[in-house]
Regions:
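Register position in tetratricopeptide repeats
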Residues: 19, 53, 87-88, 121, ...
């Protein structure tokens, strides 16, 4: 067999392997064919397609660039390169690819359709809509155009319009990948959990093994309180991918909700063995260790979480509260001051910071942040309660009574608030009695 025949034979075998889903073998055969004959642009293009199917955008881009060195203006290759560059976040370079296509052939619709998602990634939603309407002038009803503009609308919070666009995609292409899952996400974001559930079920009927859909559906079921069904979805993920950290983490969350503490701890420790920097796992483990009064170990995990989570405000809030529970007041104070700098309009952040100041006996600083919390959220009975306690400690009974009265109006059934209100009422009565007695004593002396 001569070199030309062997290279063609390997390329044909690669095509068959690609059709069979044996992607790594297909890539190897194409690379062997290219090594024999490095001047065939189609083989580089096909190699790019194989790498795309393997979710390897970096190597796909390399293959497409090689193809373009041989055939510089090929529209399909430029289009695929633009798509991968968008996935990698190189949006300006992606736009250059699409614009090069449009200059050579203004009727090539994918160059407009794919620019919808590129502009969406850049946050330029006006241009995304321009591309949508330009694409529709060429192809009146393209399911991918509706899908892409739906993503833009979803990002902007225009959920109803996003759903309508995705339903158009569904009408035009009932088997469009993950279309039911996207509609489910929008309904979930709208708070319509039952409709979201129905669309996740529809997506799994189309693709029963979709790990992404199984994970999302499992979390939705957890939110619905359908814990047994939720756990079944996460276990289906683990059947395919035994080391899926997210599935183990969610099973730990389920166990925690059901007070199966040993199982929860086992799952969170397993998550950290698989992925040592998995977001949230150290915090959950710290929470469990606090329940078991193992404060030193809990603190170690909570501080590890801070190193992983960076400026994630939700995690700073959670870890700050847990450090307060662990009585690691100075650590908590540092975390919560950082949170307040990042989220100055967050009433809960100011309140938690106030609590840490109170625990450090910095009463005036605590009062300052409690008042800021109430300014941001007027109906905040817990902050009013703590403010009343702080003024009671300072001996400012009138202010303490005023704040506890407001708290009692907001939460009349709260036992702590009612008890403090009773105490302050009694204290106020005795204070007045002492004042009257002293006044009467002075009066009697004057009459003598």
């Amino acid at each position: 067999m001569n070199d030309w025949t062997e290279s063609e034979s390997r390329a044909e075998l690669a095509h068959q392997l690609y059709q069979d889903g044996r992607l790594a073998e297909a890539a190897a055969e194409l690379q062997a064919a290219i090594e024999i004959n490095p001047h065939n642009a189609s083989w580089y293009f096909n190699l790019g397609l194989v790498f795309d199917s393997m979710d390897d955008s970096v190597r796909a881009c390399e293959a497409y660039r090689k193809a373009l060195e041989i055939e510089p203006g090929d529209a399909e290759t430029l289009n695929c390169l633009g798509v991968d560059l968008t996935r990698m976040g190189n949006c300006e370079e992606a736009l250059a690819c699409f614009e090069q296509i449009s200059q050579a052939d203004p009727t090539y619709e994918p160059a407009y359709c794919n620019r919808i998602i590129t502009y969406t990634e850049m946050g330029d939603h006006d241009q995304a809509e321009v591309m949508f309407y330009m694409a529709r002038q060429l192809v009146a009803e393209c399911p991918l155009c509706y899908y892409n503009i739906g993503n833009s609308l979803y990002v902007r919070g225009q959920l109803d319009r996003a759903v309508e666009c995705w339903k158009q995609t569904l009408r035009l292409d009932a088997h469009h990948p993950q279309i039911h899952a996207r509609i489910a996400e929008a309904y979930w974001a709208k708070g319509d959990l039952e409709r979201a559930k129905r669309h996740y079920q529809a997506d799994l009927r189309t693709d029963p093994g979709s790990v992404e859909t199984l994970m999302d559906f499992g979390e939705l079921l957890m939110e619905l309180g359908q814990l047994a069904e939720s756990g079944e979805k996460f276990r289906r993920v683990l059947e395919q991918m035994p080391d899926h950290s997210g599935a183990h983490f969610c099973l730990g969350e389920l166990a925690l909700q059901q007070e199966r503490v040993d199982e929860a701890e086992q799952q969170f420790r397993l998550v950290l063995r698989i992925t040592p920097d998995f977001p949230g796992a150290h915090a959950r483990l710290g929470e469990l260790l606090l329940r078991r009064h193992r404060r030193k170990q809990a603190t170690r995990h909570l501080l590890a979480e801070l190193r992983i989570s960076g400026d994630d405000t939700a995690m700073l809030q959670e870890v700050g509260q847990l450090l307060i529970q662990a009585r690691k007041t100075h650590y908590a104070n540092t975390v919560l001051r950082r949170l307040v700098r990042l989220a100055p309009q967050d009433a809960q952040a100011h309140h938690n910071l106030a609590v840490s100041f109170f625990m450090m006996r910095r009463i005036d600083d605590g009062i300052l942040h409690c008042r800021r919390a109430i300014k941001l959220k007027a109906q905040y009975p817990l902050a009013l309660y703590n403010l009343a306690l702080a003024h009671l400690q300072k001996g400012s009974l009138r202010r303490a009574r005023r704040y506890i009265s407001r708290a009692l109006t907001l939460a009349p059934d709260d036992k702590r608030i009612r008890e403090l209100s009773r105490r302050l009422g009694t204290t106020d009565i005795w204070s007045r009695l002492r004042l009257r007695r002293r006044g009467n004593d002075r009066g009697r002396k004057m009459r003598m």
